[in-house]
Amino acid sequence: MKDMKDTARRRPLPDAEADGVIEGRNAVIEALRVGTAIDKIYIAKGETDKTLGHIASRARDAGIVVVEADRRKLDGISRTHAHQGVIALAAVREYVTVESILSAAAERGEPPLLVVCDEISDPHNLGAILRTAECAGAHGVIIPKRRSAGLTAVVAKTSAGAVSYIPVARVANIPSLLKDLKKQGAVSYTHLTLPTT
């Protein structure tokens, strides 16, 4: 019986899951149970179902962003049109911690070069940033948990493979992270793009 479970775990994901979209109550519960890296979970607005409540609670406990969305939004994201009121967006690779990025730089005897992004919501832009950061020799990229694109299939494709090489960490609060890094002696350079009117 154990061999069958191991084989089942290694089966290729259906196309919908391979691109990071996990649909349906049981599929999302199982993804949470095995520790799949999930960027965000959408739950149908106004649903009071016990199972959806369990999913939301478990996701929040794991630090995953839970968003209530109307059914039209869920239908728009859905690949199977059988989402049962819940869709998880899984990352194409695991996130790391900021500490692990800093440790890797220290092990190499190099001052850490980090690219910190805030509110990069377009996955194509994040993919391009990952590609550029990897080419520039950055030790890692840091993004916020909210108001940012995650490590989706679109980001992976746009990064031209860089997502497989550059570590990416997610943090709850970018300003707090920058203060902590400054206390550790980090120097920061900032680029702001202001909207044109």
Go through each PLM region and give its residues.
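N-terminal positively charged helical leader segments and presequences
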Residues: M1-A104
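Histidine/lysine/aspartate-rich catalytic loop segments that bind and position anionic ligands
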Residues: H139-Y189
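Glycine- and other small-residue-rich loops at beta-strand/loop junctions that grip anionic moieties
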Residues: G20, A44, D118-E119, P144, ...
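Basic, flexible Lys/Arg- and Gly-enriched helix-loop patches that mediate nucleic-acid binding at interfaces
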Residues: R93-Y95, E99-G109, S121, L130, ...
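Amphipathic alpha-helical repeat scaffolds
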Residues: G24, S121-A128, N173
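Conserved small/polar residues in nucleotide/adenosyl-binding loops
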Residues: Y189-T196
